[in-house]
C-alpha cells in the first residue's frame, strides 16, 4: 500500500537548520513512510495522545510530527522542531 507524503511549507523552511546527519535521517524517514506509515522497527515513533492520526518521530534532538490520513493514503509532515518546542502550537 503506497502513501503520498506531503511536506508542509513551514517544514521545508525549517529543514535548512537541520544538521546534515539529521537531514539524511529525515530523507530516509520520508522514503520509508511512502510504504510504511508507522515504521516502529526502524524509527522511534509514538502516537500523540488525543489523536489516532498524529505521530511523532525522534531524529536526534529534533521531533517530526506527521498526520496519517488512512482513507486517502496521505501522510502530511506538519512540523519539525527541537525537542524543547516540539509539542507547543506554532
From Swiss-Prot:
UniProt keyword list: Toxin-antitoxin system
Gene3D superfamilies: RelE-like (3.30.2310.20)
Database matches in InterPro entries: RelE/ParE_toxin (IPR007712), RelE/ParE_toxin_dom_sf (IPR035093), TA_system_RelE_toxin (IPR052747)
PANTHER family: PTHR38813, TOXIN RELE1-RELATED
Role noted for this protein: Toxic component of a type II toxin-antitoxin (TA) system. Its cognate antitoxin is RelB1 (Potential).
Family classification: Belongs to the RelE toxin family.
The protein's name: Putative toxin RelE1
Gene: relE1
